[in-house]
């Protein structure tokens, strides 16, 4: 177990670890536990009653957070011709030309998300070994392999996130910044939870939402009662 500092320990004492809070209470407690000087990211971790080893219990999707993430999202687009222009007009930061592709092969990752038109997947596929492990591989299921590059760029810039359940049945995503305040964070959290509920696999038996925990980058976790999602 990692050893936490004095301030973390002090803040942890203010949170009842056995309690389960509603959305507003949980976010207010989490924000009150922030003790660092930088604008921390607020994260949410949801443990689901699924076994992702089975394909029919995989939970994966995207959601547009109503208030974004509070940070600039750098977007790289694999496109050519008119689609390249559309991507740039929509706000894309980089176009993957030959020089950029070579930089990626050499270890450059100055972008947060990647989009590709279907006709460029031959080029993208050659970068699979470097993009895949970093979660940067364009994927049709998350809307990042598409000819509608303008829409894809705009959505990512606005705070659209993609997620998938991990081996332990947990989905972990950022939902904003401490500076957002409780109201905007609650809106983002609810949008994410509602999407998780909508994606419940038919084969999932028993309790689906097992635990929901919210925390700041450096702060302790605060549990949300799943009953408040109904």
UniProtKB/Swiss-Prot annotation:
GO cellular component: large ribosomal subunit
Keyword Ribosomal protein part of the UniProt annotation: yes
GO biological process, one term: regulation of translation
GO MF term list: rRNA binding; structural constituent of ribosome; tRNA binding
SUPFAM superfamilies: Ribosomal protein L1
InterPro entries membership: Ribosom_uL1_bac-type, Ribosomal_uL1, Ribosomal_uL1-like, Ribosomal_uL1/biogenesis, Ribosomal_uL1_3-a/b-sand, Ribosomal_uL1_CS
Superkingdom of the organism of origin: Bacteria
Pfam families linked to this entry: Ribosomal_L1 (PF00687)
Keyword terms of this UniProt record: Repressor, Ribonucleoprotein, Ribosomal protein, RNA-binding, rRNA-binding, Translation regulation, tRNA-binding
UniProt subunit comment: Part of the 50S ribosomal subunit.
Family: Belongs to the universal ribosomal protein uL1 family.
Function summary: Binds directly to 23S rRNA. The L1 stalk is quite mobile in the ribosome, and is involved in E site tRNA release. Protein L1 is also a translational repressor protein, it controls the translation of the L11 operon by binding to its mRNA.
HAMAP family associated with the record: Ribosomal_uL1_B
Name of the protein described by the UniProt record: Large ribosomal subunit protein uL1
Organism placement in taxonomy: Bacteria, Pseudomonadati, Thermodesulfobacteriota, Desulfobacteria, Desulfobacterales
């Amino acid at each position: 177990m990692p050893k936490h500092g004095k301030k973390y320990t002090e803040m942890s004492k203010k949170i009842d670890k056995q309690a389960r809070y509603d959305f507003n209470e949980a976010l207010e407690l989490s924000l009150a536990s922030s003790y660092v000087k930088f604008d921390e990211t607020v994260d949410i971790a949801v443990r689901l009653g699924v076994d992702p080893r089975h394909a029919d219990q995989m939970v994966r999707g995207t959601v547009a957070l109503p208030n974004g993430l509070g940070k600039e999202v750098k977007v790289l687009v694999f496109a050519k011709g008119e689609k390249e222009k559309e991507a740039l007009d929509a706000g894309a930061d980089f176009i993957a030309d030959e020089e950029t592709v070579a930089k990626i092969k050499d270890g450059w990752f100055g972008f947060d998300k990647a989009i590709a038109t279907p006709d460029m997947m031959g080029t993208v596929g050659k970068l699979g070994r470097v993009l895949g492990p970093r979660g940067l591989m364009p994927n049709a299921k998350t809307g990042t392999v598409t000819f509608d590059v303008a829409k894809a760029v705009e959505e990512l810039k606005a705070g659209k996130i993609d997620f998938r359940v991990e081996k332990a049945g947990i989905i972990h995503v950022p939902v904003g910044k401490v500076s957002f305040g409780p109201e905007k964070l609650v809106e983002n959290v609810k949008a994410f939870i509602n999407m998780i509920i909508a994606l419940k696999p038919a084969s999932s038996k028993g309790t689906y939402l097992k635990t929901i925990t919210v925390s700041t980058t450096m702060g302790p976790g605060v549990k949300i009662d799943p009953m408040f999602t109904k």
